[in-house]
Amino acid sequence: MSTAVTPILLFTNWPFYVDKRLFAYLYRIKTDPKYPIVDLEYIKNKANELASENDQFQAYLREMDSNQLDKLVYSLSEDISPKISCTSCGNCCKSLMVNIDEDEANRLSEHLGKTRADFDDAYISKGESGRMVINSIPCHFLVENSCSVYEYRFAGCREFPAFHVPDFNKRLFTTYMHYDRCPIIFNVIETLKEELGFEKSK
């Protein structure tokens, strides 16, 4: 007894449409390090490679509706940030100039068992306007890539990279200052390009 076999057509002449973003995503998984990307050397090199593309992307983002962009960036950040360990990276602590207010200085000086005067002498620079910043880059409190005063870290450190703050497209310059050194920023920006279907013009 013979059994009829129905052939399966793998290719047809019918028109079909493919979302190019899917292929971009699959290509990224195949060629890039494990996603999300946390290899700092790779990120630095890739940032140099994508410099021209990122100039165009910034111009593209400035034309977007600010509220819609904020929602998308926040959503991507909420997905990506938990997958990247800031406490095992510490790269931002090697490059950020951190502002400090009086309450933060008082709290940390007390934690360290120092008078405010001694704390200020050791760790703070003050401008003519009274603005206070940490006087060392890398930060004094970075020890083996981890913050030694993590529970007492400053607001600027807690909020970085500030994807939850409104008006993202007005902070592109400062965001891109750290694109080549912060895995969260790098991954959010690159995923944002895919979500928006952005392609560099030639």
Residue ranges and their predicted role:
Residues 19-202:
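Short loop/turn segments that flank or connect secondary-structure elements
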